[in-house]
Amino acid sequence: MNTQQLAKLRAFVPEMRKVRHIHFVGIGGAGMGGIAEVLANEGYQISGSDLAPNPVTRQLTKLGAQIYFNHRPENILDASVVVASSAILADNPEIVAAREARIPVIRRAEMLAELMRYRHGIAIAGTHGKTTTTAMISSIYAQAGLDPTFVNGGLVKAAGTHARLGSSRYLIAEADESDASFLHLQPMVAVITNIEADHMDTYHGDFENLKQTFINFLHNLPFYGRAVMCIDDPVVKELIPRVGRYITTYGFSEEADVRITHYQQKGAQGYFTVSRQDMADLKVVLNAPGRHNALNAAAAVAVATEEGISGSDILAALAGFQGTGRRFDFLGNFSLEHVNGKGGSAMLVDDYGHHPTEVDATIKAARAGWPDKRIVMIFQPHRYTRTRDLYDDFANVLNQVDVLLMLDVYSAGEVVIPGADSRSLCRTIRSRGKLDPILVSDPAKVTAVLAQVLDGHDLILVQGAGNIGKIARNLAETKLQPSLNEEKHNG
């Protein structure tokens, strides 16, 4: 951003008093790194710490941020404020040092709320679909020439980053309900995509508490703000009468204000009509597969329509939508001639979905777009608590694929829960008689095991939220070919 654009921005976004140096603990996370990137581009001095380098930290280093790959008290030297990821514990040395030095320690969402304070905020919340919906809305606003700032939880492929500082008053942000921190936000427009039981430890196992928290979030809107709510979701629909704000509903339902009809999928694209009250219908070509993505697009249409964005800009943005990282992310189509000698090819798709509903949506999109292909899934369960709480749902959903390779549970710091491990889940799926899962406890063996099960007309889904994305990238880089060491080790 040049000096003139920054001056224009300062006209409606004043600086944070005496704050000059902002330190992030856990800066490598997508959400944390995105906020840090926006603040770096606004001219603040940025530093941060994490355990290992990744694309987020490398991008921030290019912007001049000082990144430490350790957690030490001296890292916060001269910081005006310390921003802590929700994954950071209270006894972290940097947090302890900041409190002893009386430096304010805030959560990620509090800093996001500060970014939103003087802007026209659009916040996207819900159990599933937040990242993609945020990216779609950002793409439409950019197409319309509105140059928004956005902060997303995933890579926005068209921008090549998780976050971007725009010169306008618009801020489009993913809102995180996992720790209820989205209650810090005070947007002008809020989207609720859906609500399911997830992160229930935050809500003390009480689903009513979770629902009330979403209502409280919507009541952070000013009385003249707008809630955009998916009426297809039964829990969201149930909450509508309890929301005292202007509401626009969307979905496939006949009751929806912004309604999807005539949906068809051909390969990776969706074709459908969006009907809007008292406005011309939109014939949408969406460059993203699955009915779930049509719903995400309908939410984006509802937000854009409220802003007065033209139908032509909406359609152009959705047709050219490049997607987000690890959301049905097509990594290539690879020949198997040198993989297992069987010939043919295999498509490789990487997907972040780690809740049964998300996994089910990915499988359905794959079936609809490529009905002649076998679905070979490599799945890594994420957290023992989630596996325990949604055990039967996982077993039912995973039973839909043709071949299943199961990795060990990615613990995310949790202790092992007996009966909620991958071996138990494989045993349960096998007992149902349709599928014989293959447990691959050693990630280094995945490529070799995969080579043995491919038959030349497969769609490989690499599925999960842990470190399985590295496996997907490795498969793409090696074109699915196991190394000699893998073959020998496996043999």
From Swiss-Prot:
Q: Does the UniProt entry include the keyword Transferase?
A: no
Under the heading SUPFAM superfamilies, the entry gives: MurCD N-terminal domain, MurD-like peptide ligases, catalytic domain, MurD-like peptide ligases, peptide-binding domain
Q: Which domain of life is it from?
A: Bacteria
- PANTHER family, sorted: UDP-N-ACETYLMURAMATE--L-ALANINE LIGASE (PTHR43445:SF3), UDP-N-ACETYLMURAMATE--L-ALANINE LIGASE-RELATED (PTHR43445)
User: Which region is the signal sequence?
Assistant: none
Q: Name one GO biological process term.
A: peptidoglycan biosynthetic process
Q: Give the residues the record marks as binding ATP.
A: 126-132
Please report which protein family the annotation says this sequence is part of.
Belongs to the MurCDEF family.
What name does this protein carry?
UDP-N-acetylmuramate--L-alanine ligase
Just give the chief location class. cytoplasm
GO cellular component terms attached to this protein's record: cytoplasm
Q: Which residues form a coiled coil?
A: none
- Top class in the EC scheme: ligase
Q: Which UniProt keywords apply?
A: ATP-binding, Cell cycle, Cell division, Cell shape, Cell wall biogenesis/degradation, Cytoplasm, Ligase, Nucleotide-binding, Peptidoglycan synthesis
Q: Which reaction does it catalyse?
A: UDP-N-acetyl-alpha-D-muramate + L-alanine + ATP = UDP-N-acetyl-alpha-D-muramoyl-L-alanine + ADP + phosphate + H(+)
**What's its job?**
Cell wall formation.
Task: From the UniProt record, report the name of the gene that encodes this protein.
Answer: murC
Molecular function via GO: ATP binding; UDP-N-acetylmuramate-L-alanine ligase activity
Query: Which pathway does the protein contribute to?
Result: Cell wall biogenesis; peptidoglycan biosynthesis
- Compartment(s) where it occurs, according to its Swiss-Prot or TrEMBL record: Cytoplasm
EC assignment: 6.3.2.8
